[in-house]
Amino acid sequence: RSIYNRGVEAGSAPYVPRLFHDVYTGVDVRQKKALSAGELHKLLYEDPKSERLRRTQIIAALMFQFCGMSFADLAHLEKSALDQSVLRYNRIKTKTPMSVEVLDTARGMINQLWSNQEPIPDCPDYLFDILCNNKKRKDERAYREYQSALRNFNNRLKDLARVLRLKSPVSSYTLRHSWATTAKYRGVPIEMISESLGHKSIKTTQIYLKGFELKERTEVNKGNLSYIRNYRLG
């Protein structure tokens, strides 16, 4: 899939919607993607002394503070998704309806990004200026634009990790996996983690479990943020 995406972006391969829909492209469970609490703290809170990398750091921090939101979901958030202090949206991958309370720290970061972003006349609906194509991944141009944005973010994230001297590899998946691992380490029920991430299922028995309220999921999110922010390095 990665090779195909590069080919489409370079114009060497035709764009075929949902080409890998019936092909398993999941992650090997043996491949560790989550950062330790110490490295995650450094990634999100140490000063990279670079405006370019600071913007990347803010985006990464928002992904973590939005309950491990994927880069695709963050990039495609529309302004209408922000309803006062709650984000309401459908996941790009599964179309699962999601709601995330925007913590005060996240609100400050959103304002930081807004203060430095230029208005995009052709696409005024996105919450952030990560994308500007108004087709929302429904055509080849939008698909290429998103793949390019994802590649650029991952490259800058690697630069950020290198500047902060992290030993572990990082990518856009790192924030999502790290949020889930932090919650698991803190004893949060797997059902709560799954629902907060917007996963469709973990076990058949989960169908019979009561859903968690937004207030409960917000407390889990606040706990994760507090744990990482206050983590004491060596």
Placement of each model-derived feature along the sequence:
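DNA/chromatin major-groove-contacting recognition/catalytic segments
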Residues: E101-D104, Q112-L113, K210-G234
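Short, polar N-cap/turn motifs at the start of nucleic acid-interacting alpha helices
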Residues: S80-V86, L166-S168, V188-I207, L233-G234
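Basic, Lys/Arg- and aromatic-enriched nucleic-acid-binding interface segment
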Residues: P14-F71, A75
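Active-site/catalytic core of tyrosine-dependent DNA strand-transfer enzymes
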Residues: L40, L103-K167
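Catalytic-site neighborhood detector that most strongly recognizes the C-terminal catalytic loop/helix
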Residues: A34, R91-K95, N134, L197-K222
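Short, charged hinge/linker segments at domain and secondary-structure junctions
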Residues: N5-D28, C123-D129
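Short, basic (Lys/Arg/His-rich) helix/loop patches that form interaction surfaces
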Residues: K49-S50, E145, N154-E195
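Conserved tyrosine-mediated DNA breakage-rejoining catalytic core shared by Y-recombinases
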Residues: H21-D22, H76-Q112
